[in-house]
């Protein structure tokens, strides 16, 4: 519910911005025309320096935004304010009550048209999630180290400028951590295989000593010949294959590691900003129960979830965490007009996109745990790809700001009835969409 006690079911839309930038440096020869960088359309140019830890994003791109060029042509110097007026009226008409995180930091929220000209409810990204110089696996840090605690304090300090802004509903600590893309990952197994002496290895040894009377009992249980617990500092590859007891111990310590991964920055964030809700990690999916470790340090358990029917999945996650669950990304694209790629989930037509939206959101709303979702994304992507190397036909509007009425009308229908569905006073929309195979890479 909101601060005044009214029910608030998130009907969100991600990256509500005037345009959608496309990469130039890799595709320059494919453009028949590009504007001068210091000319009339200078505001359409930008540069992006990617996070080197995100393999899915290009490291550097020089971008141009033809949607923004169209707005400048239409409205001249007042283009930004005109776009904001138009978009705010549309969001209200569609029943959208949250504009997502929009790739914030603070400057994106406050300096975007929707931040300048209105106070539209939104979320916030805290910053770059804390890392340690030596990681356990991919971007998973040495979570019991002093370094991790110090980096978490720096991370949480990023909330200081926004802690009193009332139209920010809450914050995400990160988005789709790279380590979480391995469906059968046992993070403690990666710890034992690591060649360096990490602080978390010392904690693991203490954990094992607490479970076994002596080194002989441990060696027998794990089918591992070592002379002392200190020998566990020596890399042990594929430890899950040793014996059943090893799998049980590793699973238990993985939970402890993931819990610490969430706990340390979450507590630091709450110290700095007690006013906003912590929505967590935007995991790409939950493949095993240990991924929910640390949920008690969050206010809402959030996931990105690309499927057609979330009901069973939401109920499963809700049963693990026993707290509100939100979806921060989902979409369904089509190929009957516009861009040539469906996105992560495809349906046959634009009309079926509306069917898919209603089916997804209302099926979720019929569960006890679901508190809303944020559709990805507001605008169709550039035909020659964004800096995430995507050109998906998934927007609410096209490059000329023309709405895809088939989906926006459907969103409005769901917005009108979703509170009754959530309260059990109405049945959810139950027309399954006509699914087609995705053609995204």
Model-inferred region functions:
Residues 1-111, 129-164, 237, 243-244, ...:
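Active-site-adjacent substrate/metal-binding segments within catalytic domains
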Residues 5, 91, 99, 171, ...:
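Conserved, mostly hydrophobic/aromatic
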Residues 27-79, 165-291:
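Polysaccharide-binding and catalytic clefts of secreted carbohydrate-active enzymes
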Residues 60-71, 129-141, 233-251, 284, ...:
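Active-site clefts of carbohydrate-active enzymes
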Residues 106-114, 179-187, 277-313, 379-391:
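Substrate-binding cleft/loops of secretory-pathway carbohydrate-active enzymes
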Residues 166-170, 174-176, 330, 345-398, ...:
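Substrate-binding cleft of secreted/luminal carbohydrate-active enzymes
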Residues 188-202, 376-441:
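Aromatic-rich peripheral "rim/lid" segments of glycoside hydrolase catalytic domains that contact
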Residues 252-343, 358-365:
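Glycoside hydrolase catalytic-domain groove-lining segments
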């Amino acid at each position: 519910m909101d601060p005044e006690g009214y029910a608030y079911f998130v009907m969100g839309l991600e990256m509500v911005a005037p345009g959608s930038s496309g990469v130039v440096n890799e595709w320059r020869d494919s453009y028949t025309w590009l504007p001068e960088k210091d000319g009339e359309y200078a505001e359409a140019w930008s540069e992006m320096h990617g996070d080197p830890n995100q393999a899915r994003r290009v490291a550097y791109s020089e971008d141009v935004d033809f949607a923004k060029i169209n707005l400048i042509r239409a409205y001249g110097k007042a283009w930004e304010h005109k776009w904001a007026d138009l978009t705010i009226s549309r969001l209200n008409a569609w029943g959208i009550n949250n504009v997502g995180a929009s790739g914030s930091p603070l400057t994106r929220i406050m300096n975007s048209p929707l931040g300048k000209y209105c106070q539209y409810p939104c979320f916030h990204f805290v910053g770059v999630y804390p890392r340690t110089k030596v990681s356990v696996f991919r971007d998973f840090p040495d979570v019991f180290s002093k370094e991790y605690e110090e980096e978490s304090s720096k991370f949480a300090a990023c909330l200081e400028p926004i802690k009193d802004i009332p139209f920010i509903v809450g914050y995400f600590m990160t988005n789709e951590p790279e380590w979480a893309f391995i469906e059968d990952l046992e993070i403690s197994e990666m710890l034992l295989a690591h060649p360096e002496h990490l602080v978390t290895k010392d904690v693991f040894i203490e954990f094992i000593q607490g479970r076994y009377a002596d080194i002989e009992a441990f060696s027998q249980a794990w089918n591992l010949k070592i002379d002392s617990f200190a020998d566990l500092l020596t890399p042990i590859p594929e430890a899950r294959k040793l014996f059943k007891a090893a799998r049980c111990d590793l699973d238990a310590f993985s939970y402890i590691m993931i819990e610490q991964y969430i706990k340390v920055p979450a507590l630091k964030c709450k110290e700095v900003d007690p006013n906003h809700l912590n929505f967590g990690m935007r995991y790409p999916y939950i493949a095993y129960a240990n991924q929910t470790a640390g949920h008690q340090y969050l206010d809402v358990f959030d996931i990105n979830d690309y499927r057609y029917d979330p009901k069973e999945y939401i109920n499963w996650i809700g049963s693990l965490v026993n707290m509100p669950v939100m979806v921060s990304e989902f979409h369904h694209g089509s190929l009957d007009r516009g861009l040539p790629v469906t996105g992560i989930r495809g349906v046959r037509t634009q009309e079926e996109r509306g069917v898919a939206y209603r089916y997804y959101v209302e099926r979720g709303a019929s569960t006890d745990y679901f508190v809303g979702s944020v559709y990805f994304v507001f605008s169709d992507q550039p035909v020659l790809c964004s800096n995430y190397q995507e050109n998906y036909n998934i927007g609410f509007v096209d490059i000329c700001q023309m709405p895809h009425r088939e989906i926006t009308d459907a969103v409005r229908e769901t917005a009108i009835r979703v509170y009754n569905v959530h309260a059990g006073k109405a049945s959810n929309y139950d027309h399954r969409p006509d699914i087609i195979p995705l053609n995204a890479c």
